[in-house]
Amino acid sequence: MHDIKAIRDNPQAFDAAFTRRGLAPIAGSLMKLDEVRRAAVQAAEQAQARRNAASKEIGDAKKAKDNARAEALMAEVTELKTTMPALDAAVKEADEALKKALSEIPNLPLPEVPEGADEHGNVEHHRFGEKPSYSFTPKPHYDLGEALGMMDFEAAAKLSGARFTVLKKGLARLERAIGQFFLDVHTGDHGYTEVNPPLLVKDDAMFGTAQLPKFREDQFAAGAIGSGGEGYWLIPTAEVSLTNLVRESILDEKELPMRLTALTPCFRAEAGAAGRDTRGMIRQHQFTKVELVSITTPEQSKDEHERMLSCAEEVLRRLGLHYRVMTLCTGDMGFASQKTYDIEVWMPGQGEGGAYREISSCSVCGDFQARRMDARSRGSDGKPRFVHTLNGSGTAVGRALIAVIENYQQEDGSIAVPDVLQPYMGGLKVIAKA
């Protein structure tokens, strides 16, 4: 969420950055809402101040035995008591209107983010490795998985409907191995602290990381739980749980950056555009992901963003997968992001002749989420300030499974197990039909 004071101080600069997202200028309408709020606050404060002063004057009038003045002042206080609830209600209404407006507009892109309307405006940053070559035509993961008897979409549809998958035997074990491998690298080599967070969160948590209110329809609501009747949400990403661990807190800057990671199921009601990726595991309502979250000072966040990207890349490098890194343009960035790198892994079984598919997004959010969460830090000067937050996939386990299946497929339909995963598979080198 944005700082209305900063918008008031320089509305032209705010609109210049905001319109780079392809959106209309908005600073003027926000300042009008703020003017209404400030006027309401001023009226309420003046009424309270007059009530306090009049109450004191009543005592003075009584001491002076000025009964007429005392009675007039008491009548004034009574009238103020009657009008003040309406003034307080006006303040609350104006506050909520401004907060709602601020909560529904996206973060501002950093100056170096390329301009563009959609994914076609994204810019390649760099790439790793080469596309593998085959003496046969590579198959998509769903054909390979079904032929192995280890990927069952029909059974999943009976249980849950479209966009779910049942994994069995070797592929179920392979997905588990990938997730464990990712966690071991990030905790053992990259210094992240492993967390096992709740999968159900409250409204405040979803608001804090900016899934609510704008993306309410994209989420799975778990309904009312318990006698309190409070609703819960299934997390769309562990970013929600991990980032909100610092909500409503003041951290010691000596402890920053704080780096957290979690391997969790994720749940998303929006599984992509209608008719797109309807087969296979690319777009699922439920999927597994290793999330990376960093909490930093403003001075640390830029370097931390580059570091997070390299951590996400490293697990793919160790798997021997070819990928490219894209800098997302202003029109393709996420709502809370200031700048985002997407890692797109090569999948030879996708489309005609293979395709790059997103497997990780690494974003720096500045203080956008911190303001929503009231997450601050205190440095040597003793003054609290908002932290910066970053999040990234380290990486999506289901898509990494697809990438391994398609890149390591063999002509007979079996799947070679990458060397780094074999210890997690009990030494198994090939997944084949029994």
UniProtKB/Swiss-Prot annotation:
Entry's localization field: Cytoplasm
Chemical reaction(s) catalysed: tRNA(Ser) + L-serine + ATP = L-seryl-tRNA(Ser) + AMP + diphosphate + H(+); tRNA(Sec) + L-serine + ATP = L-seryl-tRNA(Sec) + AMP + diphosphate + H(+)
Record-listed E.C. numbers: 6.1.1.11
UniProt pathway: Aminoacyl-tRNA biosynthesis; selenocysteinyl-tRNA(Sec) biosynthesis; L-seryl-tRNA(Sec) from L-serine and tRNA(Sec): step 1/1
Protein residues bound to L-serine: 237-239, 291, 393
Entries under Pfam families matching the protein: Seryl_tRNA_N, tRNA-synt_2b
UniProt keywords, alphabetically: Aminoacyl-tRNA synthetase, ATP-binding, Cytoplasm, Ligase, Nucleotide-binding, Protein biosynthesis
Enzyme class: ligase
GO annotations of cellular component type: cytoplasm
SUPFAM superfamilies the UniProt entry points to: Class II aaRS and biotin synthetases, tRNA-binding arm
Keyword Repressor included in the entry's annotation: no
Gene3D superfamilies associated with the record: Bira Bifunctional Protein, Domain 2 (3.30.930.10), Serine-tRNA synthetase, tRNA binding domain (1.10.287.40)
Record-level GO BP terms: selenocysteine biosynthetic process; seryl-tRNA aminoacylation
UniProt entry tagged with the keyword Protein biosynthesis: yes
Single GO MF annotation: ATP binding
Binding site for ATP: 268-270, 358-361
InterPro entries: aa-tRNA-synt_IIb, aa-tRNA-synth_II, aa-tRNA-synth_II/BPL/LPL, Ser-tRNA-ligase_type_1, Ser-tRNA-synth_1_N, SerRS_1_N_sf, SerRS_core, tRNA-bd_arm
Domains: entry comment: Consists of two distinct domains, a catalytic core and a N-terminal extension that is involved in tRNA binding.
Purpose: Catalyzes the attachment of serine to tRNA(Ser). Is also able to aminoacylate tRNA(Sec) with serine, to form the misacylated tRNA L-seryl-tRNA(Sec), which will be further converted into selenocysteinyl-tRNA(Sec).
Subunit structure: Homodimer. The tRNA molecule binds across the dimer.
Family statement drawn from the similarity comment of this UniProt entry: Belongs to the class-II aminoacyl-tRNA synthetase family. Type-1 seryl-tRNA synthetase subfamily.
Stored HAMAP family: Ser_tRNA_synth_type1
This protein's name: Serine--tRNA ligase
Organism: Rhodopseudomonas palustris (strain TIE-1)
Gene: serS
